[in-house]
Amino acid sequence: IKQFELVDCLSDFDKIISVAKMKTHVFMGVTGAVKNLFGCIVGTDKARFHLRMQKHIDFAHVMVDLYQTIKPTLNIIDGITAMEGQGPMSGDVVDAKIIIASSDGFAADLIMADKMGFDAEAMPIAAAGIEEKRIVHLKDIKVVGDGKDEQFHFVKPHTYKSMQDTYLPKFILKLGQNQLTSKPVINKNCVAC
């Protein structure tokens, strides 16, 4: 899927600022500046992407395309209070007391994942961005400011080791696809041209 409908108001602004929470995510490992833009996709399209993109890396490629489409001017990740474990729905609060900001959302996400104690470049969105040659490597990012040497050890989601697997049982997938996939309706006047 290379098309998505975005909220209309994006075109009303000269510059976009992405403000995300620092948290773990059972499907994507972590979620930060890039995944935050998923909120700009209209309505049921979000569910459609989740149902059709069952592999972490496939969904991550959509997030890379979405980020490149919106291109925020500034990306801020709020880690003053963050989330670890089974985020974003059932995680636990962590007082990380950190804010990450960058003009490059991928760089912000790499630094965030690294600070959380994750293999930053193995996270699906980072891996997709690296594969598409759209992002820099962690070692090439210069970090400045207070807390630049701060390191945390966030509890990882239970899915962390299986980031290449699908995340929903097949019967739920089938049910969801049936409900959210449009089907053509043939008009009785159709002459099969």
Where are these regions (language model features)?
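Short, cysteine/histidine-rich loop/knuckle motifs that typically chelate Zn2+
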Residues: 192
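Extended, low-polarity segments enriched in aliphatic/aromatic residues
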Residues: 1-189
